Amino acid sequence: MGKTANIDDLESILLGVSTSSGDPSIDLGRLCNALSLLHVTLGEKSWVGLYLVHKGQLILGPFQGTPACEIIAFGKGVVGTCHAKQEPIAIEDVTKIENYICCDAAAKSEICVPIVKDGTPVGVLDIDLPNVHYFSQEEIKFYEGFAKKIADLLH
């Protein structure tokens, strides 16, 4: 995991993510806390957030980090492509990607994981790191598990 966090640190985050209360207002707070916990673990220079499906596009949801792109079309950039393919996409070096949408010049690597609730795609978990980074299969599995926990908090 290079300069960010090790897999044990990440796995401990899953224990800290609360389950749904059934109340959208309470769950929004739980969702924000889960993203904050991941952001702090990865380091202050990271960006962690959600893009949520709304009216045929992905709109910026709760996040931790610098201001970000507010709307991303399906199939565009890493986030939109992740949603279109419905599979995780890990980019070691974003400068090597043709259709990369640069929302933060500090981002050097990115991983996106689809969020699915009750069989329906509802969004994308997006994580940007400030260094070129190879994402291991262990990390990808962690982020998939994190996305499942996040799906439980979405209403």
Residue ranges and their predicted role:
Residues 47, 112, 124:
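Short hydrophobic/aromatic beta-strand element in the GNAT-like acyltransferase core
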Residues 18, 129-155:
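Juxtadomain coupling helices with adjacent low-complexity linkers
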Residues 116-129:
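Sensory-domain boundary capping and coupling elements
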Residues 109-116:
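A short, aliphatic-rich beta-strand micro-motif
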Residues 26-30, 34, 74, 138, ...:
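Short amphipathic alpha-helical segments
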